[in-house]
């Protein structure tokens, strides 16, 4: 079964997707982490973001596993903390605004997924990466709640950050993503939208599992 979990940044979609992967015992592809990996190698190897061919020639390997996505550069595992910095996040957002890059990375995702069962989480998951998925969930939350979550996440990693700056960046990114002339950010037409602002992780997971069960039965997948 293919499950697409989409939504804006810091909405809680990654946490939910990891748990769903563990509960169903199927691999998890965190597409945002892959974006950050290419952003990281762009900075590390000093490759301009416009040089798409060079970026995709770099030694990056993506391995979806139960409850996590592992990425390797030159055969070595990448420290996830290095991928969570503000600098890498900014570069990832810049890459995401380039249509050719999105086309290439979406092609890479499709090659990784192929016909395997997988939880695919990230922007465009239900609209462009696996639009054929029988289960599509769009997880969202208020900008303020998302900024609070991202602030707490970065503080735990030891970064000195400002809540106001994070909120402003979230608002700017939402606007930029929704106004993209190509690949505008929006839920798939048949996605179930879940607002997590006032819900616990456990509540959201149960809601998603219920949707999976219902969609699976209707699609005669169980």
UniProtKB/Swiss-Prot annotation:
<feature type="binding site">
    <location>
        <begin position="7"/>
        <end position="15"/>
    </location>
    <ligand>
        <name>ATP</name>
    </ligand>
</feature>
<dbReference type="GO" id="GO:0005829">
    <property type="term" value="C:cytosol"/>
</dbReference>
<dbReference type="InterPro" id="IPR003136">
    <property type="entry name" value="Cytidylate_kin"/>
</dbReference>
<dbReference type="InterPro" id="IPR027417">
    <property type="entry name" value="P-loop_NTPase"/>
</dbReference>
<keyword id="KW-0418">Kinase</keyword>
<dbReference type="Pfam" id="PF02224">
    <property type="entry name" value="Cytidylate_kin"/>
</dbReference>
<dbReference type="GO" id="GO:0036430">
    <property type="term" value="F:CMP kinase activity"/>
</dbReference>
<dbReference type="InterPro" id="IPR011994">
    <property type="entry name" value="Cytidylate_kinase_dom"/>
</dbReference>
<dbReference type="GO" id="GO:0006220">
    <property type="term" value="P:pyrimidine nucleotide metabolic process"/>
</dbReference>
<dbReference type="GO" id="GO:0015949">
    <property type="term" value="P:nucleobase-containing small molecule interconversion"/>
</dbReference>
<dbReference type="GO" id="GO:0036431">
    <property type="term" value="F:dCMP kinase activity"/>
</dbReference>
<keyword id="KW-0547">Nucleotide-binding</keyword>
<dbReference type="GO" id="GO:0004127">
    <property type="term" value="F:(d)CMP kinase activity"/>
</dbReference>
<comment type="similarity">
    <text>Belongs to the cytidylate kinase family. Type 1 subfamily.</text>
</comment>
<keyword id="KW-0808">Transferase</keyword>
<dbReference type="GO" id="GO:0005524">
    <property type="term" value="F:ATP binding"/>
</dbReference>
<keyword id="KW-0067">ATP-binding</keyword>
<keyword id="KW-0963">Cytoplasm</keyword>
<protein>
    <recommendedName>
        <fullName>Cytidylate kinase</fullName>
        <ecNumber>2.7.4.25</ecNumber>
    </recommendedName>
</protein>
């Amino acid at each position: 079964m293919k499950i697409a979990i989409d939504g804006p940044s810091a909405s809680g979609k990654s946490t939910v997707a990891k748990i769903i992967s563990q509960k169903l015992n199927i691999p998890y592809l965190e597409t945002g982490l892959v974006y950050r990996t290419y952003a990281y190698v762009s900075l590390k190897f000093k490759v301009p973001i416009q040089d798409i061919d060079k970026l995709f020639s770099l030694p990056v390997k993506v391995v979806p596993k139960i409850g996590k996505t592992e990425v390797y550069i030159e055969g070595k595992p990448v420290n996830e903390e290095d991928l969570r910095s503000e600098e890498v996040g900014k570069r990832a957002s810049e890459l995401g605004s380039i249509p050719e890059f999105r086309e290439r990375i979406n092609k890479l995702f499709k090659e990784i997924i192929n016909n395997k069962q997988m939880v695919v989480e990230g922007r465009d998951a239900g609209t462009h990466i696996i639009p054929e998925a029988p289960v599509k969930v769009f997880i969202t939350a208020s900008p303020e709640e998302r900024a609070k979550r991202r602030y707490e996440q970065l503080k735990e990693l030891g970064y000195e950050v400002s809540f106001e700056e994070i909120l402003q960046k979230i608002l700017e990114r939402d606007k930029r993503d929704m106004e993209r002339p190509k690949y505008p950010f929006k839920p798939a037409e048949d996605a179930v939208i879940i607002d997590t602002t006032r819900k616990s992780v456990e509540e959201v997971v149960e809601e998603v599992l219920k949707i999976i069960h219902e969609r699976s039965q209707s699609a005669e997948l169980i």
